[in-house]
Amino acid sequence: WFWGTYNVICQELGSSVTNFQLFDEVNHFNHTAFSASVDALLKKQESLLIILNTPAHNPTGYSLSSEDWDHVLDCVKKHAAAGKKIHLLVDIAYIDFAGEKHETRAFMQKFSNLPENILTLFAFSMSKAYTFYGQRCGALIALSSSKAVIDEFGEISKYAARATWSNINRGAMTLLTRIQQDKTAYASYEAERDALYRLVQERGDIFMQEAAQCGLPALP
């Protein structure tokens, strides 16, 4: 289960996607499959980009637990200790529809003080978080224990962004700036988004209850 466009993006860059079985037999995050896939790839190559779409994974809605993240980080730190370079991309496009905003971000504390050869990346989507889907806008945020790595990331990102799409959507940039600077507008935005989040959760709860009643298998 994954967003199919990852394939298209990788193909354009001359890379390929390798998947792992997301859920185990009891519909929990499949630690064994994840580790086995990472181990197999890093036997053949010196670096690896890992993409994890969480919280509120597309298309399943699944969110990794704190224990799931501990397993993921134990796995990548093991390979980092062997000299491998790991890029861990966390696609948080739907984070603001995954739960209480502080709780859904708590896992980010786990990425402090990682080895220098682990670069953590967060892919953020304003289009989703700001209920602005028709205006495509987002951000790529990097976290590293090395200032040199962050400086290099900044320079490469500026070059790649300019070469790929020049400048991003001006209307979206303007809206984001105004909302962040206006406390009244920001409060109104949060209220609107929270109402939509509650609606999504209510619909999801109804579906899961009725699926259980009629014996329809459903993903967690």
Q: What does each model-found stretch correspond to?
A:
Residues 1-15:
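Substrate-binding/gating loop at the entrance of the active-site cleft, primarily
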Residues 2-4, 55-58, 94-96, 127-129, ...:
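Short, solvent-exposed loop/turn segments at secondary-structure junctions
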Residues 7-11, 60-66, 94, 98-108, ...:
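A short acidic (Asp/Glu
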Residues 16-26:
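Short beta-strand->loop structural element characteristic of the AMP-binding/adenylate-forming
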Residues 24-100:
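Active-site phosphate-binding strand-loop segment of PLP-dependent enzymes
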Residues 38-45, 73-86, 111-116, 144-149, ...:
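Alpha-helix termini
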Residues 113-197:
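Conserved core segment of the aminotransferase class I/II
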Residues 189-220:
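Conserved PLP-binding catalytic core of the aspartate aminotransferase-like
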